[in-house]
């Protein structure tokens, strides 16, 4: 396919003095922050689905974008044209990673055999594109939610044949991810939930999910895939209630089926807020549980109750999230993937670049602000001081199992304990954070 973004040059860093909307003002891939480059810290990725599989349609109207590769025609030819445009975009954006679902990159076909054959051919195409451009795959996944067969889920479907079809897709998607050097494999249970309890057997569906995830783990080890397996939590939409509601729920599920050492989580900002949590809360919770894996960077609209997948633009939110990540040692195989889509009125080809450039710049600012908080360590010092008692004789004794309820009660009476509350100084810390963010 002819060059689609022919009037757009490769995006470069020009600094804060630049007013060029097609240049980075803050994201400088090789700039060192805490001894590591921005590129290594952030591990940025762009997604295939919103950028190249969506024409701007919504439930109230037809598509608003000019996407020639989505027009009617030979499905495989259109898929190859889509790959041409996608890798042109990724390369010009100067982003190091990308992510995909199986049917983003390959026609599903009219049978499972067609699906397998088409996907194998397109994996060849993607492999060649990666070699040509130097782009890497952050993660792959299988779409087990769009086709009508998955109306009641895949792993949680009441029909074992649907379960089987979904398992087949996951096997081939994981195989392709391994072949393409993917660093993670994601499972998002968009339809793994229920619409009504009137026709749902919760225990049965949970057992099915547990078996499905065990099969995924078995296949990972069978083929020697070294990447992380990631579950992406979301509370609802498209189902009324999803079984991977939030990070804590996922942890409980994994513990029940002995999988807590096999999976991490891929946290999406908009999913966190839909679950009634802050983005920072979900990241901090995942880290505290040993589940942190990767991030889908986006944002929701506070006035809307659905997944808007807008580009991240809150430096405060991003700084606090990156602070949590840096405290924990940074990403291993994960990164920041832009699971984001343009507003359907943003129909100029430049808009796709401008939106991603903004997101990359905001993450770069957040990284630098988070690094300042790490270096100043005022938050770390405040937390250490607040919990200092647990490093004393009593605190260590309690946590070390030296006391039971009766012996603690006796100690409390014998020493006539009258503990006093000490200020948490929330407002002081909020002011200090704002001083870092805004000066």
UniProtKB/Swiss-Prot annotation:
SUPFAM superfamilies: Xylose isomerase-like (SSF51658). The keyword Magnesium applies. Binds 2 magnesium ions per subunit. Its main location: cytoplasm. Its cofactor is Mg(2+). Mg(2+) 1 binds at residues 232, 268, 296, 339. Mg(2+) 2 binds at residues 268, 271, 307, 309. Keywords: Carbohydrate metabolism, Cytoplasm, Isomerase, Magnesium, Metal-binding, Xylose metabolism. One of its GO terms (molecular function) is xylose isomerase activity. Homotetramer. HAMAP family: Xylose_isom_A (MF_00455). This is Xylose isomerase. It comes from Pseudoalteromonas atlantica (strain T6c / ATCC BAA-1087). The gene is xylA.
